[in-house]
Amino acid sequence: MTIYLFLTDRMKRGGYVYIMSNPKNTATYVGVTASLLIRVSQHKDKINPDSHTAKYNITKLVYYQGFHHIEEAIAEEKRIKGMSRKKKHLLVSALNPEWKDITDDVIE
């Protein structure tokens, strides 16, 4: 019974879809997470040196969107990943025209 309640509670957890970029805004990464600040810190700290984000110095959080359910965030991640580079650029630019690192603006 406890395990079932734990799984049910986790399924109701919210989540975030996010886009990160390198300093010159020539490489991006789209991801999804339940804990945005922790995940962004992992990218910035390059905890996996062989990863795409570490290899291309993708350390700036330039876009994020929160959802009440992690499944919604996953669906949005898939939608964004299916976009062309130009459409991703327009998505970020609409909310963050200067492509600044907005990590300090995150409210979880």
Predicted feature descriptions by range:
Residues M1-N48, A54-Y64, A75-K78, L91-E108:
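GIY-YIG nuclease catalytic motif and its immediate N-terminal context
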Residues L36, H69-E71, R85:
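Residues at or immediately preceding the N-termini of alpha-helices
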